[in-house]
Amino acid sequence: MASVSYQKPTSTTVGKQMIFTGPDYIKDYLPKIHQHTSYVGEQHLALEKTGDLRYLWRPASNRSLPAKYKHEYVSEIGWRIPQYNFINKSRLGSGFHIKYEELSQASLDSITHRYQNPWQPKPHVLDMQGKQSRASFAWHMSAFEDTDQRNSKWAILVRQCKSSLPRASKPPKLPKLPKKEKKRKH
């Protein structure tokens, strides 16, 4: 028998699922809170200029509620910091923080509507695919998803079907109704 040896992982995050990763894609992203935010800039502040952020972030003078910081809003920078988590608990449970843009919503729709598609190919196309094609149609729906595109595999097959079928096997057309003749007045 082969011997199995156990090796400790190189990191605590190896083999675990990560939802938010840092810029290096190696470990979970941990936000940092900057303690001294009274001044932001590269050089020292000139005495005559106003750059004190406490002055800029002061509450309104009419005793209204203070404006919320950016980290207090869901899905903003720093919103999952444990110190401010009391704001986010209800939003996290509802899934409100997940924002779907146009492309991600389209991809979700294509996945969730895969087995709800009412379209089916015509019977002669299924017959050309061989035995058991009708029975396995629901399990191979992804092969039929792009039939509306011009160069998909099955669109080409349907085009070849239409051009190569003899006239007798094409579905019959309904006869045209005779046109009514107008009566002439003498």
UniProtKB/Swiss-Prot annotation:
This is Protein SPMIP2. Coiled coil: none annotated. Residues 176-186 have a biased composition (Basic residues). Disulfide bonds: none annotated. It comes from the Eukaryota. InterPro entries: DUF4562. It holds the Pfam family DUF4562. Residues 163-186 are annotated as: Disordered.
